[in-house]
Structure formats: structure tokens, C-alpha cells
Amino acid sequence: MKCLLLVSLFFLLPATAFAVPTKPEQFEKLENEFSLECQKYGAESCAARFISMAACTYVFAVNQGKHPDEAMDISDKLFVGIMRGNKIKPGIMFTEERNIKPSIVNEVAERTAFCKEATEKAVPKLFNARGMEEPSLEIQKRLTDSFGYWWISNIETIYKQD
């Protein structure tokens, strides 16, 4: 029940400082205290949930003024911590071809839609942070709609480099 409350606060109050952990003790607390019933949901579903939380944390951090690189570091630490805290090995997420399993991809796409508003706000900020011209509203919408897939693609790229 405590975890359900924490997750609810995490997604309902994205402007709070806790929504974007930045201090080592916040990451440690998440790792030690945030747990889902992964035996009930399955490790793959839990991994998809954690990937989605990391993706949403990224856009929350960007919207709070963090540079995209810093936002990525924050979301990576969050992901690693909650995966470790829930004793889920990253290898379970991948096929033999080193792609994220389709069931995880689909769940991440669904779950990242929960932070769609935050993603919409973050897209122009991401372009501005890189010194690029803001894309048209149509392109911003497409980027927002495909955010979960982009996030998955980044994870696959990193995993394939190892």
C-alpha cells in the first residue's frame, strides 16, 4: 500500500522535488523502499513500469530546468536503483537479438502516455537546450506520441554497444 501511494504521488505531483530525485539519499530511499509485487505482475511488466518511470522522470527533470544530459543521469540512476531494489536483472528485458521484448515495448508505450503533457512541454525545451530550432507543432506532436519508442530505442542502442 505504501508503494501504491508513492507511485501515485510520483505521477500526480510531477512538480514536486521528490518527483525528480537529485540527492543520493533520495535515490537510495527509492532503491531500498520502492517495491512492486513483481512476482504478481511478472518481472517483465515490472521492468516496463520502471522504464516508463525513468522516461517520465526524464521529461519531468527537463521541465524543471535540468539540462537534457543531467535529466538523463537522473533518470538512469532512478532506473538502476529501482531495478536493483526489486532484484530484476536487466537481461530479462531483451530478446536473443538484443532487442527489448515486444511485450515490454508495448507496455512502455502505454505507460509513457501517462506523462504525455509533460512530454509535450519538454520537446521544445530539448531542442532549445541543444541550440536547435523548435520543430513545428505537428512534429512536436509526433515526437511526443513516439516518446516511449524513442526511449526504448536508446536503451537498445546502449545495450547493443556492450
Residues covered by each model-derived region:
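Generic cytosolic/nucleocytoplasmic N-terminal low-complexity/intrinsically disordered segments
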Residues: 1, 22, 28, 39, ...
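Classical Sec-dependent N-terminal signal peptides that target proteins to the secretory pathway
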Residues: 1-21
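Short, intrinsically disordered, low-complexity terminal segments
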Residues: 12-16, 68, 119
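Immediate post-signal-peptide N-terminus of mature secreted/exported proteins
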Residues: 19-66
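Short helix-capping/linker segments at secondary-structure and domain boundaries
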Residues: 59-70, 157-161
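Compact alpha-helical subdomains of small soluble proteins
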Residues: 72-162
